[in-house]
Amino acid sequence: MGALLKLSRLIDTVNEWIGKLTMWLVLAAVIISAGNASLRKAFNIGSNASLEIQWYLFAAVFMLGVGYVMLRNAHVRIDFISSKLSKRTNAIIDAIGIVVFTIPLSIIMINLGWPVFMRAFDTGEMSQNAGGLIRWPMWALLPLGFSILLAQASSELIKRVAFITGHTSEPFSVEHGKSEAELLAEELAAEAARHEQELAAGKAR
């Protein structure tokens, strides 16, 4: 189990890096989208290539970021049910879901997506729109994204099994359900509460 947990940590580290890199694609998509809109409205200038790069970036954010979302345990779940269950029960449910749904789906989508990508790459498939972009980078995102998801699903399965069998004390490698933004918001709220208490104490004197 020790070797598997080391593999899990390696996968987590890679997906953490991919996720943070993907965040910059969101900024790039916003800048390009704003630039396209500004040029179109102000100068009546536009191109199919600039519009299609937005779609590519949008697809890349979702397909490359899917593993990071799973790492952060940020996928949608029915909180009012899972919050009432023990960590062990939740870990068992997660492990079953990963084995029955996530891993098989990822393998199927990789097998279906790879031939589509290779065909587009071999034929040099281009957009049907005038001045559009080549298509294979977009098709590559399908097998690549599900490969990332498959790797992270395997990592999560290792962690759940390790927790269930008593090899780790936590089923998650990161803090459950709290993003950096949420932690910052909690810190700011606590600081505001302290400030109000100081003001109230000052008035009491």
Regions found by a protein language model. Give the residues of each.
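Alpha-helical transmembrane segments and membrane-interface helix-loop junctions
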Residues: 1-205
